[in-house]
Curated annotation (Swiss-Prot):
Upper classification of the organism: Bacteria, Pseudomonadati, Pseudomonadota, Alphaproteobacteria, Rhodospirillales
EC number: 7.1.2.2
Membrane topology of this protein: Peripheral membrane protein
Listed name of the protein: ATP synthase subunit beta
Species this chain originates from: Rhodospirillum rubrum
EC category name: translocase
Assembly, per entry: F-type ATPases have 2 components, CF(1) - the catalytic core - and CF(0) - the membrane proton channel. CF(1) has five subunits: alpha(3), beta(3), gamma(1), delta(1), epsilon(1). CF(0) has four main subunits: a(1), b(1), b'(1) and c(9-12).
CDD domains: ATP-synt_F1_beta_C, ATP-synt_F1_beta_N, F1-ATPase_beta_CD
Keyword Hydrolase: no
């Protein structure tokens, strides 16, 4: 396709820019460049309108563009730098550094639009990824090379949970991570960067960094937010395919990817579908998700925070991502209101890996028994609210007492929340998690007060806390 093909801007409508070409038209998804008062502005071709005009989506602000301005076709899609040099750096959607630490110099650049691996290239074994977070490892374990959705409304702790996962996995697993910040708060992106420097995950002096960051935050135009997840994924694919790594790919927040698509969809003149979303919702989501997979060379394990508009899981945006997930971790506001963090709902979180053939018989039985006790407590809550605890049978009272202890034992102090809570974070081994909950459901700890189980790591700490409480009471 013709490189350096020149065109002129004919119309600017928000983030959508129409460009007229006299010669050959650039193909769909090609990158065009223009100069906007000294800044390089990249436009991506979205539609061909008639013989000589293309409709494009801008990757940055379009203020200052004028009709008649010259635009150059680059002859290919948007590319981003890939390789070990991107670790420890923050880039934007077009691969420019935004951390004020000089240019990112790499031997290669990859296009952000790439084909998903073929059937023959994919690997299918199931292996558990231990996170050190009790509720996740017990109830909805994550698999290597799997896709995990973190569902929750505003302010229930999705971002904190993602930060803890990055922290635990970088320490316990030592692999590389790529973090794509899609349409979230810039403050959180800045906090994450500084926390990673403090934790040693980003090494400013040497080359020990474990994570690459790609940001397209809330203040960015929708074009950048709709493409930044693809830019991050491209960097993760390099580590998987060229270096044979098991990579972790974090997206915060995948809903904003859909939201950005819906913002430009109307400007592109498409007829909206249900709830005003773009008609290509499932296609856009599939194109991103199908590239996140394990191949025979390495794997990409993806953790995606999914904002649920108005806490409605049937909304088309969260519903479109459900189909692609291997495990779901649902955060519940009513659990957060009890002060139990992480506010993961053990009855609403699922995993394909919670299968005796994958996790083993003991783990499976303990997890199901924990869910059974919590479900019984949930169904008794109406009776308790109306008639009180005294009207329950002896057996039901025991179930309620155990369920309340289990609920509290599912909470855990996080390393990344130390600055707010003052209590040091805990990383709990899978063995300790299973042992602790097995003892709880079998009634070994019926004599301990429920408050002893709140915000501790393993069972030994709960017993220690109970002794301390007894000593203080005496």
């Amino acid at each position: 396709m013709a490189k350096n093909n020149l065109g002129t801007i004919t119309q600017v409508t928000g983030a959508v820019v129409d460009v007229k070409f006299e010669g050959e038209l650039p193909s769909i998804l090609s990158a065009l460049e223009t100069d906007n008062h000294g800044n390089r502005l990249v436009l991506e071709v979205a539609q061909h309108l008639g013989e000589s005009v293309v409709r494009t989506i801008a990757m940055d602000s379009t203020e200052g563009l004028v009709r008649g301005q010259q635009v150059t076709s680059t002859g290919g899609p948007i590319t981003v730098p890939v390789g070990p040099q991107v670790l420890g750096r923050i880039m934007n959607v077009i691969g420019e550094p935004v951390d004020e630490r000089g240019p990112v110099v790499t031997a290669q650049r990859y296009p952000i639009h790439r084909q998903a691996p073929t059937f023959a290239e994919q690997a299918t074994e199931t292996e558990i990824l231990v996170t050190g977070i009790k509720v996740i490892d017990l109830i909805a374990p994550y698999t290597k090379g799997g896709k995990v959705g973190l569902f929750g409304g505003a302010g229930v702790g999705k971002t904190v949970l993602i930060q803890e996962l990055i922290n635990n996995v970088a320490k316990g697993h030592g692999g590389y991570s790529v973090f794509a910040g899609v349409g979230e708060r810039t403050r959180e992106g800045n906090d994450l960067y500084h926390e990673m420097i403090d934790a040693g995950i980003i090494d400013l002096e040497g080359d020990k960094s474990k994570v690459a960051l790609v940001y397209g935050q809330m203040n960015e135009p929708p074009g950048a937010r709709a493409r930044v997840a693809l830019a991050g994924l491209t960097q993760a694919e390099y580590f998987r395919d060229e270096e044979g790594q098991d990579v972790l790919f974090f997206v915060d927040n995948i809903f904003r990817f859909t939201q950005a698509g819906s913002e430009v969809s109307a400007l592109l003149g498409r007829i909206p579908s249900a709830v005003g979303y773009q008609p290509t919702l499932a296609t856009d989501m599939g194109a991103l998700q199908e590239r996140i997979t394990s191949t025979k060379k390495g794997s990409i394990t993806s953790v995606q925070a999914i904002y649920v508009p108005a806490d409605d899981l049937t909304d088309p945006a969260p519903a479109a991502s459900f189909a692609h997930l291997d495990a779901t971790t649902t955060l519940n506001r009513s659990i957060a209101e009890l002060g139990i963090y992480p506010a993961v709902d053990p009855l609403d979180s699922t995993s394909r890996a919670l299968d005796p053939l994958v996790v083993g018989e003991e783990h499976y039985k303990v997890a199901r028994e924990v869910q059974r006790v919590l479900q019984t407590y949930k169904s008794l809550q109406d009776i308790i609210a109306i008639l009180g605890m005294d009207e329950l049978s002896e057996e039901d009272r025991l179930v309620v007492a155990r369920a309340r202890k289990i609920q509290r034992f599912l909470s855990q102090p996080f390393h990344v929340a130390e600055v707010f809570t003052g209590s040091p974070g805990k990383l709990v081994s899978l063995e300790d998690t299973i042992k602790g909950f097995k003892g709880l459901v079998e009634g070994e700890y019926d004599h301990l007060p429920e408050q002893a189980f709140y915000m501790v790591g393993n069972m030994a700490e709960a017993i220690e806390k109970a002794k301390k409480m007894a000593a203080e009471a005496a």
